Regions:
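Glycine-rich, anion-gripping cofactor-binding loops and their flanking helix/strand elements
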Residues: 63, 213-299, 410-440, 455-456, ...
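Conformationally flexible catalytic loops at phosphate/diphosphate-handling active centers
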Residues: 144, 148-203, 359, 364, ...
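A short, small-residue-rich loop immediately preceding and capping a beta-strand
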Residues: 21-24, 44-46, 64-103, 210-213, ...
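Glycine-rich, acidic loop regions that bind phosphate or pyrophosphate groups
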Residues: 100-141, 241-350
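Active-site diphosphate/adenylate-binding microenvironment
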Residues: 11-12, 16, 20, 26, ...
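Thiamine diphosphate
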Residues: 99, 107, 113-114, 265, ...
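Glycine-rich phosphate/diphosphate-binding loops that line cofactor/substrate pockets in enzymes
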Residues: 8-20, 60-66, 90, 148-153, ...
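Phosphate/pyrophosphate-binding active-site segments
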Residues: 1-2, 136, 174, 295-396, ...
């Protein structure tokens, strides 16, 4: 049997060899040969309603599974519509392979119809990108793309394929082991540094483990828990790291940073040792950098050497895969335990008592009202039915922060959100990808009325594939986070933030063939959530919440993380 194939068929064969089961995309003229082969159904294609959402859905697939997500777009506007999703996955280190069509090779550079310099445009927002010149070059490019996307620090890779490459023919030769000269990463970590770090952990009197998304990417949640329990250290998880340590774990404090808890931020301020694992000391965590953790030494473990020392100098830098480093580190920590465990027992106990006191002094307490639905009330109801086990894909804004504060996650890969880029419109298509990847799992799309209206066409995708998504719109009639800043820092001059028009949820969902309802009574919230969960298919809930609620605690721009605004200003008697 001849292995002479068209480029389009070679591409599908490569996807099958990479164990790609499904992809998200939107066809166009130059990708027609590829879609003709996809018609055979060996790789399931999900048709979205906008290319940006194809990339977000691929991210949701990847974030919830750890596998590479795949998206596809045609040339020109199709490819440029992917850019926001590529930047989003780049900033959050999500493995995505984007396939784009391109005009025929002879027309490149001629301003042909639907031509764009996709290769040039995406150089800054991908780990790597390819422009394939011949059908015979496809196997190497595709397999290298998957290898680069998933290895080292994960990220997006784009493969740009001209139409004549799709239509051309070549003998398909499977690619063996990928070896890329110049592309190197050090997964193991330096043994001497690991031993120094283990010793420093036992020496510390007020340690804190700072776990980021890198712990989840590395599949190191179990090893993180082992370390936390062995050294009996309090721990925090970043917005991207939530679920790396179960929310129910007695050593877990909460999320730190701009909208983190009082206890987490105070712990950072007074700690004498930060054990940073797969976290990058982002500005949303540190606040004013010069004032961050002034008494702390730092152990920093990250697969990407660029991140170590970029924002906060590390006393013990360890370049390596978090899982492999923790495997070794846990052995050394356990080896040192008999001689070291008792040296700071009293100080460690006092440290944990101090953190417990901070947690009791200013707990994350939801607002409650009989007159209107408080946003935290809605979030708590989602938490009640999820029980720490459901996937929640959040959009960007106040609802995202309340979700991070009040929803429990007992496992990694349950909390999906656009952390670094903060892309509004992310929540719904990401939930689509997560639901497709996890058909037996309960998935919530937690969105605001602003972000939801950016991705509203994807209701058609949800209906088309009868995805049992539970879409919860936290509708406060505003771009809530922007309004909060205008209220607090711009003398309440509310400029261009009112979202006065919102479609009738029942009619909107009904137009797509599934149920929806609007909830305005606080007493109805729990029942509405229960009804949505019991329904076997998709369900849209439009929950009208208090329009002027703010997310607290809040660290103002330029402030240290212990300079928190803990609640609304108290009225002054005159």
């Amino acid at each position: 049997m001849s292995n002479l194939m068209t480029g389009a068929r070679i591409l599908v064969e490569c996807l099958l060899r990479e164990n790609v089961e499904c992809m998200f995309g939107y066809p166009g003229g130059v990708t027609l040969p590829f879609y003709d082969v996809l018609y055979e159904g060996k790789v399931k294609h999900y048709l979205v309603r906008h290319e940006q959402n194809a990339c977000f859905a691929a991210e949701g697939y990847a974030r919830s599974t750890g596998r590479v997500g795949v998206c596809c777009a045609t040339s020109g506007p199709g490819a440029t519509n992917l850019v926001t999703g590529l930047v989003d996955s780049m900033m959050d280190s999500i493995p995505v392979v984007a396939l784009t069509g391109q005009v025929t090779t002879k027309l490149i550079g001629s301003d042909a119809f639907q031509e764009a310099d996709t290769f040039g445009i995406t150089r800054a927002c991908t780990k790597h990108n390819f422009l394939v010149k011949t059908a015979g070059d496809l196997p190497q490019a595709i397999h290298e793309a998957f290898y680069i996307a998933a290895s080292g620090r994960p990220g997006p890779v784009l493969v740009d394929i001209p139409k004549d490459v799709f239509m051309g023919s070549a003998h398909y030769v499977p690619v063996g082991t990928i070896h890329l000269p110049g592309y190197k990463f050090s997964p193991e970590g330096h043994a001497g540094q690991i031993r120094r770090a283990a010793q420093m952990m036992w020496e510390a009197q007020r340690p804190i483990v700072y776990a980021g998304g890198g712990v989840i990417h590395a599949g190191a949640a179990g090893l993180l828990r082992e370390l936390v329990e062995t050294i009996d250290s309090p721990a925090v998880c970043t917005l991207m790291g939530l679920g790396a340590l179960p929310s129910s774990h007695p050593n877990f404090i909460s999320m730190p940073g701009m909208h983190g808890s009082y206890a987490a931020n105070m712990a950072f301020t007074h700690t004498d040792l930060i054990i940073a694992l797969g976290a990058r000391f982002d500005d949303r965590v540190t606040g004013r950098l010069e004032a961050f953790a002034p008494h702390a030494r730092v152990i920093h473990v990250d697969i990407d050497p660029v991140e170590i020392g970029k924002n906060r100098q590390a006393d013990i830098p360890i370049v390596g895969d978090v899982r492999r480093v923790l495997e070794k580190m846990n052995r050394v920590v356990a080896e040192l335990a008999p001689a070291q465990k008792e040296r700071n027992t009293v100080a460690r106990r006092e440290w944990k008592e101090r953190i417990a006191a901070w947690m009791a002094e200013h707990p994350l307490t939801p607002s409650v009202s009989d007159a209107e639905i408080k946003p935290q009330h809605l979030i708590r109801e989602i938490d009640r039915v999820s029980g720490g086990e459901a996937i929640v894909s959040a959009d960007v804004g106040q609802h995202q922060m309340w979700g991070a504060q009040f929803i429990r996650f007992n496992h990694p890969r349950l909390w999906l959100n656009s952390g670094g880029l903060g892309s509004m419109g992310f929540g719904l298509p990401s939930a689509i990808g997560a639901q497709i990847a996890n058909p037996g799992k309960r998935v919530f799309a937690l969105v605001g009325d602003g972000g939801f209206q950016m991705s509203i066409p994807e209701l058609a995708t949800i209906a088309n594939y009868n995805l049992p998504l539970k879409i919860v719109v936290m509708n406060n009639g505003y771009l809530g986070m922007v309004r909060q800043w205008q209220e607090l820092f711009y003398n309440n001059r509310l400029s261009a933030v009112s979202l006065t028009s919102f479609p009738d949820a029942e009619k909107l969902a009904g137009a797509y063939g599934f149920p929806g309802r609007t909830v305005e009574d606080p007493k109805e919230v729990g029942k509405a959530i229960d009804d949505a969960v019991r329904h076997p298919g998709p369900y849209l809930l439009n929950v009208k919440v208090s329009p002027f609620e703010c997310v607290y605690p809040m660290v103002p721009a330029g402030a240290a993380i212990n300079e928190m605004v803990l609640g609304p200003p108290k009225p002054v008697a005159v």
